[in-house]
Amino acid sequence: MTPATRQEVLGLYRKVFRIAKNWQSASGQIEETMREKEYIRNEARTLFRKNKNVTDPNLIKQCIEECEARIEIGLHYNIPYPRPIHLPPMGLAHKQGRTLRHQERLRKISKPIYLKSHDEVS
């Protein structure tokens, strides 16, 4: 990782924690605000630690873009949680042969950039 990239990543990490510090939930309730602040901090720690050993410059760039997208979406919609994705038609076809490969390809294509680090939950 180049020093400039390292500085950019650390800047994003600090930015996420500053956002969490000043976060207000949409409902304005103190309990919900505290839960959302904790979620933001835990999510940042988890994803940054998960990707800390990434050395491929293209993959690092994708992770940076994902982080920036999550920040912008969270601030715009005032929700700290990732927005749900909707599978395309035939995204849940029977798991056999070519149909399975086609289903996996559809799921990969439909996954937005802000969810690339998240594992799929079945």
From Swiss-Prot:
CDD domains: Complex1_LYR_LYRM1. It comes from the Eukaryota. InterPro entries: Complex1_LYR_dom, Complex1_LYR_LYRM1, LYRM1. It holds the Pfam family Complex1_LYR. GO terms for cellular component: mitochondrion. Belongs to the complex I LYR family. This is LYR motif-containing protein 1. The gene is LYRM1.
